């Protein structure tokens, strides 16, 4: 039997011998009767249990990740520093991987001799925010499922799909595009608004120049109001960066040697913990690894 992971990997023509991993594999307008694997979220109690498990995993790994990143960057920062910086991504990533992992584990136990086609490459996000943009994309989830299968001992017969075009598609999806409507909005009212904003922009520019050389924090995942309070408490100048910093993957050299390393060198007894240990460095956003030094000096 063939296993389809998302709507992206619809490689199989014989639908009678096809198992869909979940409802997400089916187009909402498709009326065919597909063989769909059961969902692991059967009730609210199961959701609570999964959340508690993910929190324990997060609590275990945050200190280990802190030690690893300190070592890689020749720093001696506290666990709290790294938790503020990468904690939101780590929590997000553990929850996402655990959800996909449980779906795969259910089908691997229930069905035998499953054949699956996975991506031959990995997709690494440039920034944490990219994960939010991409997590609803089938193409990105296909990479997540593929990485889990590569790094866990499921009883699957594995084929590989050449995935360069999927990488290009996700990169192009993240690049900003000006729609026709936006272009047409450049009129007198728009120019007047821009003119009125000039004094505020100048003041913010001065703040930005000063703050970039004095502030301790950059690109923290928290609301603007909390940013203001934090800077005030630290006697630092609050500013807003209006420009979006875009560093697409195709312009950054991925450090494959470091990303091949594990967070801890010893084998972990808990199977999911061992999976996360294998995946973390290879999937951490570029801003926290290859671009960490660049970002911390801004």
Which ranges hold each PLM region?
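Catalytic-core helical/loop segments in enzymes performing group transfer/polymerization on anionic/lipid-linked
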Residues: 1-298
């Amino acid at each position: 039997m063939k296993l389809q992971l998302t709507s992206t990997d619809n490689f199989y023509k014989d639908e009678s011998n096809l198992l869909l991993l979940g409802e997400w594999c089916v187009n909402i307008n498709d009326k065919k009767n597909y063989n769909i694997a059961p969902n692991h979220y059967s009730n609210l109690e199961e959701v609570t249990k999964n959340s508690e498990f993910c929190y324990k995993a997060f609590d275990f790994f945050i200190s280990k990740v802190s030690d690893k990143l300190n070592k890689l960057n020749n720093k001696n920062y506290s666990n709290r520093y790294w938790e503020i910086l990468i904690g939101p991504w780590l929590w997000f990533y553990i929850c996402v991987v655990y959800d996909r992992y449980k779906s795969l584990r259910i089908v691997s136990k229930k069905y035998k001799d499953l054949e699956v086609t996975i991506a031959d490459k990995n997709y690494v996000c440039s920034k944490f925010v990219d994960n939010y943009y991409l997590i609803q994309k089938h193409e990105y989830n296909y990479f997540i499922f593929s990485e889990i299968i590569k790094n866990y001992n499921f009883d699957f017969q594995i084929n590989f799909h050449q995935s360069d075009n999927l990488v290009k598609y996700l990169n192009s999806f993240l690049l900003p595009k000006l729609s026709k409507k936006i272009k047409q909005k450049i009129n007198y009212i728009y120019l007047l608004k821009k003119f009125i904003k000039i004094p505020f922009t100048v003041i913010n520019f001065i703040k930005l120049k000063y703050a970039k050389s004095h502030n301790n924090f950059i690109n923290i995942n928290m609301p603007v109001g909390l940013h203001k309070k934090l800077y005030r408490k630290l006697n630092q100048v609050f500013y807003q960066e209006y420009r979006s910093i875009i560093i697409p993957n195709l312009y950054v050299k991925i450090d494959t040697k470091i990303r091949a390393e594990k967070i801890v060198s010893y084998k972990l007894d808990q199977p999911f913990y061992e999976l996360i240990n294998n995946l973390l460095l290879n999937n951490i956003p570029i801003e926290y690894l290859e671009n960490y030094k660049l970002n911390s000096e801004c």
